[in-house]
């Protein structure tokens, strides 16, 4: 792995020296290509425009180093075998036999596979290499290689030289936790839940709902002791007062059931864009960055928009005019 890191740093240094003052423009174009704002051909054209004819190879070497770093396809060459002598130790020495030239040559030469030390590549579908797939297209979390590639480009854009494996692991865990917070903000608007220590939400979708017409139902929920019941606790333990007896826990459960309504809530439809919009509007702290929040709210509102009948008719008329102009007939 250290070899690929040194190769990437060397390729980046060579490319930066070849670009000179155009290095910021190159990082901006690289970021646009990773975001799929421009195609690979457009990125290559801009790179050739910023580089001279003698330094175009630096652009290719840098892209190859990034792809090699992200893929991490390192294949260790197999052993070449032993070249020890054919004579066995401990064998009584007899009369020395003169071997022929052919026997000496067979003993010294061992055939080797010329591709044994070559790097192995996984075969891919040709259609997968045509476009860069993003998370918004695949509807799945990015792989470790994709996330590391994005982090490398961002690091180069801010003047950093490299990205460590620990940083990629931290960003992966942070991404998973952020998505869990978004799901919690959406589900908490649809299902009832309980609180632990006044802030931790759990037991989503519990069937026991407070009965608003009973005065003691609110008190039963507010005075609920959130502790796991145990049969016995050691005397003198520091947390012995926080445990409750199983009989007390059973009495609390019976009281909650008696203070709850007899009608269960109907099953809800799947989560849609309206639920996501409401969850982000109520729980504004789910996305702390105002720029990211505004951009995602705009995307959600665009997904909720749909054309009316007049707009559909105008679109059909426009398509017919384009087809007539091109000499095509619509069936």
UniProtKB/Swiss-Prot annotation:
GO cellular component: nucleus; SAGA-type complex
Domain of life: Eukaryota
The protein, known as: Transcriptional adapter 1
Protein role: Probably involved in transcriptional regulation.
Keyword annotations: Nucleus, Transcription, Transcription regulation
InterPro entries: Hfi1/Tada1 (IPR024738)
Subcellular location, record wording: Nucleus
Gene name of the record: tada1
Similarity remark: Belongs to the TADA1 family.
Species annotation: Xenopus tropicalis
